[in-house]
């Protein structure tokens, strides 16, 4: 990892794992690691496995709140706790790794600024992704003070195929034997906490072995399995390139990555949902009629007539805004575009035990190519019903098992009330 800061960081004897309920409650432990000099003050990379990006911003929070950590912690919630840390200068690289049912931000690389809005003194961003636009968080660069650069990578992690689980266990068994045989060989690397067994050569050997086995085996299943492992290796290489820009990294896992609920789906009765749909149909009919009239005549009289209807008052501001930008607005096109821009609902996918196992194997395959993190944070997210309460304990144990298999001894801190999520 880059920077001279790395050379002066303290090392934990065992990898600390902080397990909390609400996701933003991991932040005090990250700040504690910064204060104890286990993490640098700046240029930290943050690897975030979650069904939700958590990259919103407290809309009305003054930007300078980030410089008073106790005030900051009291202002944050589960959806908006990462970006203030970026503005504070601690996180410079964020990788959101998401399952296939979570599509809130476009996949790929996003480079933008996070800074203080000169007019409101709140935190805002220069990203034009719908995720930020829909919450009114975008401002142009010239409107920002003290901007911080953020490199955001959004990466999809596919579950392994069912047939692969047993096959991968065999590969890992071989890899362990290779590690034992090479236990006398150690390497000092920029990612290590001192001498450690050679991991990179083992991973490469395993991968090469998989490729050779595939070439000599006509089984399509085996080829697919090897391709999946190779895919995880490629994703890991991409993440390693990102980590090389930072001075240290935190691995963060929300257990709803493996199984997630949209708690709002259960808040309404069938009758309430029917009423909501009927009201929405009437609203769409009114909008269609209003825009049809505007196509014929967009005079102030027409606009005011429609704006007098319930729920249509914002039409005046919309039409005035359109007229200021174009001589003859195409109201039909604007109406059609409006019908397609509803923001995606919260992800909802209650996984089977098999699906959870397959995702756990994918996470294992991904992490085994990465260097050891400085610390791990885990959010249960069960009290707010994002991770199913009947699954959360099982998922937590399985995740800890994966971490132990990869990193050895763990220093686990359970910072939540025992039994708080029991079904």
From Swiss-Prot:
Disulfide bonds: none annotated. It holds the Pfam family UPF0489. InterPro entries: UPF0489. It comes from the Eukaryota. Belongs to the UPF0489 family. This is UPF0489 protein C5orf22 homolog. It comes from Xenopus laevis (African clawed frog).
């Amino acid at each position: 990892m880059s920077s001279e800061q790395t050379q002066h960081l303290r090392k934990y004897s065992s990898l600390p794992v902080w397990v909390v309920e609400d996701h933003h409650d991991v932040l005090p432990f990250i700040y504690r690691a910064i204060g104890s000099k286990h993490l640098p003050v700046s240029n930290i990379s943050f690897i975030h496995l979650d069904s939700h990006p958590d990259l919103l911003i407290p809309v009305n929070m003054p930007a300078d709140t980030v410089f008073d950590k106790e005030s900051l912690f009291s202002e944050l919630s589960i959806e908006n706790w990462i970006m203030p840390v970026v503005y504070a200068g601690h996180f410079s690289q964020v990788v959101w790794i998401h399952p296939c049912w979570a599509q809130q931000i476009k996949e790929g690389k996003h480079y933008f600024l996070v800074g203080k809005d000169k007019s409101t003194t709140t935190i805002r961003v220069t990203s034009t992704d719908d995720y930020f636009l829909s919450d009114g968080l975008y401002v142009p660069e010239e409107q920002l003070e003290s901007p911080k650069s953020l490199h955001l990578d959004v990466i999809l992690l596919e579950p392994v195929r069912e047939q692969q689980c047993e096959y991968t266990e065999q590969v890992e068994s071989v890899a362990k034997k290779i590690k034992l045989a090479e236990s006398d060989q150690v390497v000092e690397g920029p990612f290590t906490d001192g001498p450690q067994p050679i991991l990179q050569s083992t991973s490469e050997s395993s991968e090469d072995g998989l490729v050779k086995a595939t070439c000599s085996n006509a089984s399509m299943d085996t080829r697919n399995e090897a391709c999946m492992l190779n895919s995880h290796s490629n994703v890991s290489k991409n993440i390693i390139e990102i980590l090389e820009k930072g001075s240290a990294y935190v691995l963060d896992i929300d257990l709803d990555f493996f199984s997630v609920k949209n708690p709002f789906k259960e808040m309404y009765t069938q009758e309430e949902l029917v009423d909501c749909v009927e009201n929405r149909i009437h609203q769409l009919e009114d909008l269609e009629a209003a825009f049809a009239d505007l196509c014929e005549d967009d005079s102030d009289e027409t606009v005011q007539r429609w704006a007098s209807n319930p729920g249509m008052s914002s039409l005046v501001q919309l039409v005035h805004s359109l007229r200021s930008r174009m001589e003859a607005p195409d109201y039909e096109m604007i109406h059609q575009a409006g019908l397609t821009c509803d923001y995606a609902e919260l992800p909802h996918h209650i996984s089977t035990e098999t699906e959870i196992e397959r995702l756990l194997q994918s996470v294992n395959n991904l992490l085994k190519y990465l260097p050891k993190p400085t610390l791990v944070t885990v959010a249960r997210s069960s009290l707010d019903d994002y991770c199913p309460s009947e699954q959360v304990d099982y998922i937590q144990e399985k995740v800890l098992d994966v971490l132990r298999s990869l990193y050895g001894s763990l220093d686990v801190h359970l910072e939540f009330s025992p039994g708080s999520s029991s079904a």
